[in-house]
Amino acid sequence: VKDGVTVGIGTGEQDRVGVARIAVYKAYTKYANQLAFERHARKYDELVLLAAQGKFDASLIAAIDADTRAARAGLPGSVMISDAFFPFRDGVDVGLKEGVSCVVHPGGSLRDWESIEACNQADPPAAMVFTGQRAFKH
Protein backbone atom coordinates (compact mmCIF):
# COMPACT_ATOMS: atom_id res chain seq x y z
CA VAL A 1 0.00 0.00 0.00
CA LYS A 2 1.28 3.46 -0.88
CA ASP A 3 -0.53 6.79 -0.75
CA GLY A 4 -3.75 4.97 0.14
CA VAL A 5 -3.57 2.72 -2.92
CA THR A 6 -2.93 -1.01 -3.13
CA VAL A 7 -0.02 -1.42 -5.55
CA GLY A 8 0.29 -5.20 -5.60
CA ILE A 9 -1.43 -8.20 -4.06
CA GLY A 10 -0.02 -11.69 -3.79
CA THR A 11 -2.77 -14.19 -2.97
CA GLY A 12 -3.58 -17.86 -2.81
CA GLU A 13 -0.05 -19.19 -2.58
CA GLN A 14 1.52 -21.54 -0.07
CA ASP A 15 5.02 -20.24 -0.83
CA ARG A 16 5.55 -17.10 1.26
CA VAL A 17 8.51 -15.88 -0.81
CA GLY A 18 6.69 -16.65 -4.04
CA VAL A 19 3.62 -14.71 -2.97
CA ALA A 20 5.77 -11.70 -2.04
CA ARG A 21 7.41 -11.88 -5.47
CA ILE A 22 3.98 -12.07 -7.12
CA ALA A 23 2.94 -8.88 -5.32
CA VAL A 24 6.15 -7.17 -6.50
CA TYR A 25 5.58 -8.40 -10.06
CA LYS A 26 2.04 -7.03 -10.01
CA ALA A 27 3.29 -3.68 -8.74
CA TYR A 28 5.82 -3.49 -11.60
CA THR A 29 3.16 -4.51 -14.13
CA LYS A 30 0.68 -1.92 -12.88
CA TYR A 31 3.33 0.80 -12.80
CA ALA A 32 4.37 0.09 -16.40
CA ASN A 33 0.70 0.07 -17.40
CA GLN A 34 0.20 3.45 -15.77
CA LEU A 35 3.20 4.94 -17.61
CA ALA A 36 2.03 3.43 -20.90
CA PHE A 37 -1.40 4.97 -20.51
CA GLU A 38 -0.08 8.36 -19.39
CA ARG A 39 2.37 8.55 -22.30
CA HIS A 40 0.52 6.77 -25.10
CA ALA A 41 -3.12 6.33 -23.96
CA ARG A 42 -2.82 2.55 -24.34
CA LYS A 43 -2.21 -0.43 -22.09
CA TYR A 44 1.36 -1.69 -21.86
CA ASP A 45 0.53 -5.10 -23.35
CA GLU A 46 -1.25 -3.42 -26.24
CA LEU A 47 1.90 -1.40 -26.98
CA VAL A 48 3.99 -4.58 -26.93
CA LEU A 49 1.62 -6.22 -29.42
CA LEU A 50 1.67 -3.15 -31.67
CA ALA A 51 5.47 -3.08 -31.55
CA ALA A 52 5.62 -6.77 -32.52
CA GLN A 53 3.44 -5.91 -35.52
CA GLY A 54 5.74 -3.04 -36.45
CA LYS A 55 3.06 -0.45 -35.62
CA PHE A 56 4.71 1.08 -32.55
CA ASP A 57 8.25 2.16 -31.72
CA ALA A 58 9.75 -0.51 -29.44
CA SER A 59 12.20 2.01 -28.00
CA LEU A 60 9.27 3.74 -26.32
CA ILE A 61 8.43 0.46 -24.56
CA ALA A 62 12.06 0.13 -23.52
CA ALA A 63 11.81 3.62 -22.02
CA ILE A 64 8.75 2.57 -20.01
CA ASP A 65 10.60 -0.52 -18.80
CA ALA A 66 13.66 1.52 -17.81
CA ASP A 67 11.58 4.12 -15.99
CA THR A 68 9.63 1.40 -14.17
CA ARG A 69 12.87 -0.23 -13.00
CA ALA A 70 14.39 3.12 -12.04
CA ALA A 71 11.34 3.96 -9.93
CA ARG A 72 11.23 0.40 -8.57
CA ALA A 73 7.56 0.52 -9.54
CA GLY A 74 6.95 3.20 -6.95
CA LEU A 75 7.46 0.67 -4.16
CA PRO A 76 9.97 2.68 -2.09
CA GLY A 77 8.06 4.06 0.87
CA SER A 78 5.23 1.54 0.57
CA VAL A 79 3.84 -0.71 3.31
CA MET A 80 3.94 -4.50 3.08
CA ILE A 81 0.97 -6.12 4.83
CA SER A 82 0.37 -9.79 5.55
CA ASP A 83 -2.74 -11.45 6.94
CA ALA A 84 -0.58 -14.04 8.70
CA PHE A 85 2.78 -13.92 10.45
CA PHE A 86 6.09 -14.27 8.63
CA PRO A 87 7.62 -17.57 9.83
CA PHE A 88 11.04 -16.51 8.48
CA ARG A 89 12.57 -13.25 7.28
CA ASP A 90 12.75 -14.30 3.61
CA GLY A 91 9.30 -12.96 2.69
CA VAL A 92 10.03 -9.67 4.43
CA ASP A 93 13.37 -9.43 2.60
CA VAL A 94 11.56 -9.47 -0.76
CA GLY A 95 9.66 -6.31 0.17
CA LEU A 96 12.63 -4.60 1.80
CA LYS A 97 14.73 -5.15 -1.33
CA GLU A 98 12.14 -3.07 -3.22
CA GLY A 99 12.16 -0.23 -0.68
CA VAL A 100 9.23 -1.10 1.57
CA SER A 101 9.40 1.21 4.58
CA CYS A 102 7.02 -0.64 6.91
CA VAL A 103 5.92 -4.24 7.42
CA VAL A 104 2.57 -4.94 9.11
CA HIS A 105 1.58 -8.44 10.22
CA PRO A 106 -0.02 -10.23 13.17
CA GLY A 107 3.22 -11.55 14.62
CA GLY A 108 3.26 -14.74 16.62
CA SER A 109 5.96 -16.70 14.81
CA LEU A 110 8.62 -18.39 16.92
CA ARG A 111 11.07 -16.57 14.66
CA ASP A 112 9.55 -13.07 14.71
CA TRP A 113 12.99 -11.84 15.72
CA GLU A 114 14.28 -12.69 12.22
CA SER A 115 11.72 -10.39 10.59
CA ILE A 116 12.47 -7.66 13.13
CA GLU A 117 16.17 -8.07 12.39
CA ALA A 118 15.51 -7.80 8.64
CA CYS A 119 13.70 -4.48 9.16
CA ASN A 120 16.47 -3.18 11.41
CA GLN A 121 19.15 -4.16 8.87
CA ALA A 122 17.35 -2.57 5.91
CA ASP A 123 18.86 0.62 4.49
CA PRO A 124 17.10 2.73 5.57
CA PRO A 125 15.65 0.69 8.43
CA ALA A 126 11.97 -0.18 8.07
CA ALA A 127 9.27 -0.07 10.73
CA MET A 128 7.43 -3.18 11.81
CA VAL A 129 3.93 -3.21 13.25
CA PHE A 130 2.40 -6.23 14.95
CA THR A 131 -1.39 -6.25 14.80
CA GLY A 132 -1.81 -9.21 17.14
CA GLN A 133 -4.74 -10.46 15.05
CA ARG A 134 -4.66 -12.92 12.18
CA ALA A 135 -6.95 -12.28 9.23
CA PHE A 136 -6.12 -15.63 7.62
CA LYS A 137 -8.63 -17.94 9.29
CA HIS A 138 -8.63 -21.24 7.39
Describe each region flagged by the PLM.
Residues 14-138:
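Feature captures the catalytic cores and cofactor-binding loops of soluble hydro-lyases/lyases
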Residues 1-6:
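Terminal or standalone catalytic/regulatory effector modules within metabolic enzymes
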